[in-house]
UniProtKB/Swiss-Prot annotation:
The EC number(s) this enzyme carries: 6.1.1.10
Record's keyword terms, sorted: Aminoacyl-tRNA synthetase, ATP-binding, Cytoplasm, Ligase, Nucleotide-binding, Protein biosynthesis
Compartment(s): Cytoplasm
Full protein name: Methionine--tRNA ligase
GO cellular component, one term: cytoplasm
Gene3D superfamilies: 2.170.220.10, HUPs, Isoleucyl-tRNA Synthetase, Domain 1
Subunit annotation: Monomer.
Gene transcribed to yield this protein: metG
Length: 519
């Protein structure tokens, strides 16, 4: 099996997770599941970034030890991922012992390359962004200095720190971007990065002495690594680094895909490849920066009180329903918006009507009229062959969309086919054919139900990465054994005569809770 290594960004556990975190995890999980079903040996890494000033300050404000807050909040992130059915292979925490060793080895390699030196740093620092800013990237607003880009407050910092010779990598980075046009996606982010790097790069401060919550610099324990040096290294740690001779590292590095938010593209597409070039380590193959998820078009924030809790949402509406909505509603890579009305519409229109109702109606007819067994079809008419051909061609189209991280287009293609299937079912009128005493009509009845069940099967196979539990239930209803559920089974038709279990509904319509009478 061909290996495939995919990662999410690791989240800061300084506050509770929100639906924006869930969006990235669900998208990456869908890709990991797709690759597994498509015959790949997948390694899927996610986790939390427990170091940095942001976490230390949150702990101080809460009056708890930093390690305790980081551990407690990381547990919340891990439980959220488990609640959303995220199929990670490792949930890494940057406090893990093997991660400290990996970070120190990366530092040693960059130092041995002559790319690290000691100097004095003075400039503006944003704790919230864990990022340095030059004067021209800030502005005074009502007496407070804020970053122009993110609007977060900055403080003036002066200390002796180690620097990384980022300036030496300007041309090498640009050469890599041009030689590997798919390295950064989508195109808008790629253009942003190329524009930024083309302007020339300054050396980067990569250690701090003003606090001690982080990975200690080798041979210089009074310095801790700048949180992004340590954080980015997690992708190497997850592949077994620094043991580059290990089976894990040789099999999975370089990473095939880093899935991140657009706000951290500079760290991943500029700093990270420069660190790896310095250390003599192969670069990841692709970095995809997705957009932000807003609430009714507004940025989610605690101060506004419009943050959506993904676990509460899943408990109210269903895990698979939330997973489907987030990947279907928003063109992946662009900003998108959440609203209660939009998700209920998707549940009732796409899931309950288009897929759930089609499966329920066809399987109920099979149970009632054909002894609960897959019907034996007659000769396929043009309408049958056309619908089957559309369904048969879906895997290649869906694969292409997943490889481009365009899950919304993959789902759109599947639902277009389901729209065709519903029209086909209405035109063929199996409920009329069933009552006919004509043998030809009975053959059409069996053929119509066979074709409908077959295209529902193909749809269920292909939606497994997005809705694993619900797709599994549909495949159960179609009598598909566990070894008939990989994408290799797409072209293997339903076997006539297969006994099917009694049909049950998979996607109930969502009815909002009614207030008690008299209220």
């Amino acid at each position: 099996m061909k290996p495939y290594y995919v990662t999410t960004a690791i989240a800061y556990p300084n506050a509770a997770p929100h639906v924006g975190h869930a969006y990235e995890y669900i998208a990456t999980d869908a890709i990991a599941r797709f690759k597994r079903l498509d015959g790949y040996d997948v390694r899927f890494l996610t986790g939390t970034d427990e170091h940095g000033l942001k976490v230390a300050q949150a702990a101080a404000a809460a009056g708890v030890p930093t390690a305790a807050l980081a551990r407690r909040n990381s547990d919340v992130f891990q439980r959220m991922q488990e609640a959303l059915n995220i199929s990670f292979d490792r949930f890494i925490r940057t406090t893990d012992a093997d991660h400290h060793e990996a970070s120190k080895e990366l530092w040693r390699r960059m130092s041995a390359a002559g790319d690290i030196y000691l100097d004095n740093y003075s400039g503006w620092y944003s704790v919230r962004d864990e990022r340095f800013f030059v004067e021209s990237e800030t502005q005074l607003v009502d007496g407070t200095r804020l970053t122009v880009e993110t609007g977060t407050p900055v403080t003036w910092t002066e200390e002796q720190t180690y620097f990384f010779r980022l300036s030496a990598y300007t041309d090498k980075l640009l050469a890599h971007y041009h030689a590997n046009p798919d390295f950064i996606a989508p195109e808008t982010r790629r253009n942003e990065v190329i524009s930024f790097v083309s302007g020339g790069l300054d050396d980067l401060s990569i250690s701090r002495t003003s606090f001690d919550w982080g990975v200690q610099v080798p041979e210089h324990p009074d310095h801790v690594m700048y949180v992004w040096v340590d954080a980015l290294t997690n992708y190497l740690t997850g592949a077994g680094f620094p043991d580059t001779d290990s089976e894990l590292f040789r099999r999975y590095w370089p990473a095939d895909l880093h899935m991140i938010g657009k706000d951290i593209i500079r760290f991943h597409a500029v700093y990270w490849p420069a660190f790896l070039m310095s250390a003599g380590i192969e670069l990841p193959r692709r970095i995809f920066a997705h957009g932000f998820l807003h609430n009714r078009g507004e940025k989610m924030s605690k101060s506004v009180g419009n943050i959506v809790d993904p676990v509460a949402l899943a408990e109210a509406l269903g895990v698979d329903q939330v997973r489907y909505f987030l990947l279907r509603e928003v063109p992946f890579g662009q900003d998108g918006s959440y609203s209660d009305e939009a998700i209920v519409t998707r549940i009732n229109t796409d899931l309950a009507n288009e897929l759930g109702n089609l499966a329920q109606r066809s399987l109920s007819m099979v149970a009632k009229n054909l002894d609960g067994r897959v019907p034996n079809p007659g000769e396929f008419a043009d309408a049958d062959a056309a619908l089957l051909a559309t369904a048969d061609g879906l895997l290649e189209r869906v694969r292409g969309h997943f490889d481009a991280q365009a899950m919304h287009l993959a789902l759109e293609a599947i639902w277009l086919m389901l729209g065709d299937a519903n029209k086909y079912f209405s035109v063929q009128q199996p409920w009329v054919l069933r009552k006919s005493e004509s043998e030809a009509d009975q053959a059409r009845f069996r053929t119509t139900l066979y074709v409908t069940c077959e295209v529902v099967r193909i749809a269920a196979l292909l939606i497994q990465p997005v809705m694993p539990e619900s797709a599994g239930k549909i495949l159960d209803l179609l009598g598909q054994a566990p070894n008939q559920r990989s994408f290799a089974a797409v072209g293997v038709r339903l076997t006539p005569g297969t006994a099917l279990p009694p049909p049950t509904g998979v996607f109930p319509r969502y009815q909002p809770p009614q207030p008690p009478e008299g209220k």
